[in-house]
């Protein structure tokens, strides 16, 4: 059966939604739901390099205000005597006050790379800065779990394409933007007919395999997303819709332990405060609805929401009322099951810089190792090759 270029692109488009659906996901229809009190990780990626110094503000540091005469945050919400949080993240302040938020400062890695693409690859793969890996840290987690577990663990990304973080050597997560749209597309007669009439020896056989996997599983994911309708109101932003999708799946009996979302762009070279405030407002309201939803369903104790960005920004503002690519940054951890709460370590040292950039003190791979071992109950040394200890915030 020959296909035209237009038809090939249609198949490719649907295949991209799953980005090579892993074989283990086919069996998930027959798996039991997550065990009671099973921990769930939700990753929220701040794409573009969020400015950490205008997120957690060193509110009593003269250097900060001197280097950022026009963009320094003057009305931060106090967390400690020395640190405040951006007022657009007012709900994060509420979580902090309730002991449901932790923040780790100065997170990075040796020899940092200021390229968006390369630094994101490093964060996704948990590689060294001079090491190039084709698998992601959560993808290798799937490889490890699916090898030793009777019921394989599933991961889902709410996006059109699958991130490197979720690609393993043998197993990959499943990426989709909207369960209903994916299901409706998979049910089109054209795709079903095409799949029914393909031949194994065709040069595009891999696309047909992916197409079949997507058709078989799109209905299952859509069914689970509709299983327990939420009464919680969510903002109409894209991130609000994405969190609503995640919440609906968590409340169903789908066997999913990792969810991955992203928001951006935080690449604020020009007029930073206006752009960052808009993004933070979207994040603030979406997270507020999601946490309320999880709490009302008795699930918040077992949910860990982790945020990260590929790098921070330079200490000094630029001439365009923005900031340029930097290095170390902070990470947020939100959960009803935190063991250590609040500001976990010292604020950035603005007197000790590396050519105008912050110097990292906490390796992001140690954060990953902590989450893998203490939250997901995985062998972090096998997944990461990390043997330099873990933290105790979860």
Residue ranges and their predicted role:
Residues 146-235:
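Patatin-like phospholipase A catalytic core
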Residues 198-289, 293:
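Anion-binding catalytic surfaces of enzymes that hydrolyze or transfer phosphate/sulfate esters
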Residues 84-85, 89-184:
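Extracytoplasmic mature domains of secreted/periplasmic and thylakoid-lumen proteins
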Residues 72-84, 268-277, 281-394:
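Feature marks hydrolase-like catalytic cores characterized by long aromatic- and Gly/Pro-rich stretches
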Residues 23-86, 96-98:
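Intrinsic-disorder/low-complexity recognition with aromatic hotspots
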Residues 7-27:
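N-terminal export signals
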Residues 1-3:
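N-terminal secretory signal peptides
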Residues 39-50, 92, 102, 257-263, ...:
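Beta-strand elements within well-structured catalytic alpha/beta cores of enzymes
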């Amino acid at each position: 059966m020959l296909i035209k270029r237009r038809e090939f692109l249609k198949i490719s488009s649907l295949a991209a939604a799953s980005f090579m659906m892993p074989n283990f996901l086919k069996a998930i229809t027959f798996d039991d739901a997550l065990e009671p009190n099973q921990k769930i990780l939700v990753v929220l990626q701040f794409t573009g390099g969020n400015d950490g110094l205008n997120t957690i503000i060193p509110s009593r540091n003269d250097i900060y205000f001197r280097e950022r005469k026009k963009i320094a945050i003057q009305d931060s919400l106090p967390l400690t005597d020395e640190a405040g949080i951006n007022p657009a993240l007012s709900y994060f302040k509420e979580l902090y006050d309730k002991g449901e938020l932790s923040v780790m400062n100065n997170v990075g890695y040796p020899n940092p790379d200021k390229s968006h693409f390369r630094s994101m690859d490093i964060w996704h793969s948990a590689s060294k800065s001079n090491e190039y890996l084709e698998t992601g840290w959560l993808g290798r987690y799937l490889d490890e779990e699916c090898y030793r577990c009777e019921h394989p663990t599933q991961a889902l990304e709410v996006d059109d394409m699958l991130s490197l973080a979720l690609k393993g050597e043998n197993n990959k997560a499943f990426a989709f933007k909207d369960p209903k749209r994916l299901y409706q597309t998979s049910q089109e007669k054209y795709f079903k007919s095409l799949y029914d009439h393909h031949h194994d020896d065709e040069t595009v056989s891999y696309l047909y395999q992916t197409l079949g996997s997507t058709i078989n599983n799109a209905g299952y994911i859509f069914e689970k997303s509709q299983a327990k309708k939420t009464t919680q109101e969510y903002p109409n932003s894209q991130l609000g819709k994405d969190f609503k999708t995640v919440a609906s799946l968590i409340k169903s009996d789908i066997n999913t332990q990792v969810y991955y979302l992203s928001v951006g762009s935080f690449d604020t070279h020009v007029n930073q405060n206006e752009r960052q405030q808009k993004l933070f407002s979207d994040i603030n309201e979406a997270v507020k609805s999601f946490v309320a939803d999880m709490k009302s369903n008795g699930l918040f104790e077992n949910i860990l929401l982790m945020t990260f960005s590929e790098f921070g920004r330079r200490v000094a503002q630029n001439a365009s009322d923005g900031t340029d690519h930097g290095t170390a940054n902070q990470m947020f951890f939100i959960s009803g099951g935190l063991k250590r709460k609040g500001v976990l370590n010292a604020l950035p040292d603005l007197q000790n810089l590396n050519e105008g950039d912050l110097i990292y003190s906490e390796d992001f791979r140690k954060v990953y190792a902590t989450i893998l071992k203490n939250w997901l109950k995985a062998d972090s040394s096998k997944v990461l090759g990390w043997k330099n200890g873990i933290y105790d915030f979860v």
